[in-house]
Amino acid sequence: MIKGYEEEEWIPKTRLGRLVYEGQVTTFEEAVRSGLPIKEHQIIDLLLPGLEDEVLDITMVQRMTDSGRRVKFRTTVIVGNRDGYIGIGHGKDVQVGGAIKKGIENAKLNVVRINRGCGSWECGCGQAHTVPYKVSGSSGSVRIYLMPAPRGLGLAAGDVAKKVMEMAGIKDVWTRTEGSTRTTLNFAKATYNALLNTITVRS
């Protein structure tokens, strides 16, 4: 919990929130199968209590208004359990703590369960340690390609992509990138979008 911010008692406002609160939906998979949108971060708190969070970036944003210059902080945050679940979110607030808190809450609303496997022809161990096949994702000018790697290789990736994949439970991967990977926000989001494609299409 962030210092200075206490969690308020949760009173569910959505149908899915009430189902989770009342114990009628008890797993993340049941929540997804319900077809109901996850709009309250407390749903994830109850269904995935072991999530970790990590702040990838904090930037100061200045804006001129009629009353003068206003300063806000913008954060990029990831959450995950290092075993298949990953989410990314952004937060803005006049205080750093508030921006981090909002980033964590938004990241929880974007949690997905990715598919992992042993997709490398060099390996064949059968364990879920890498991506199941080649996938790619983009955000802004950044595009990243994730390719299956043999067990023990590690994460051949830039620092930001490495943190996202570690949080998702990917242990070995080859990567190739295009665009300005120095932009933390786009690099992290492109990596997240690539991991999303392990669920949807095979490329």
UniProtKB/Swiss-Prot annotation:
GO terms for molecular function: rRNA binding; structural constituent of ribosome. Belongs to the universal ribosomal protein uS5 family. It comes from the Archaea. The gene is rps5. Pfam families: Ribosomal_S5 (PF00333), Ribosomal_S5_C (PF03719). Disulfide bonds: none annotated. This is Small ribosomal subunit protein uS5. InterPro entries: Ribosomal_Su5_D2-typ_SF (IPR020568), Ribosomal_uS5 (IPR000851), Ribosomal_uS5_arc (IPR047866), Ribosomal_uS5_C (IPR005324), Ribosomal_uS5_euk/arc (IPR005711), Ribosomal_uS5_N (IPR013810), Ribosomal_uS5_N_CS (IPR018192), Ribsml_uS5_D2-typ_fold_subgr (IPR014721). The N-terminal domain interacts with the head of the 30S subunit; the C-terminal domain interacts with the body and contacts protein S4. The interaction surface between S4 and S5 is involved in control of translational fidelity. PANTHER family: 40S RIBOSOMAL PROTEIN S2, RIBOSOMAL S SUBUNIT. The keyword Ribonucleoprotein applies. GO terms for cellular component: cytosolic small ribosomal subunit. Keywords: Ribonucleoprotein, Ribosomal protein, RNA-binding, rRNA-binding. Part of the 30S ribosomal subunit. Contacts protein S4. Signal peptide: none annotated. One of its GO terms (biological process) is translation. With S4 and S12 plays an important role in translational accuracy.
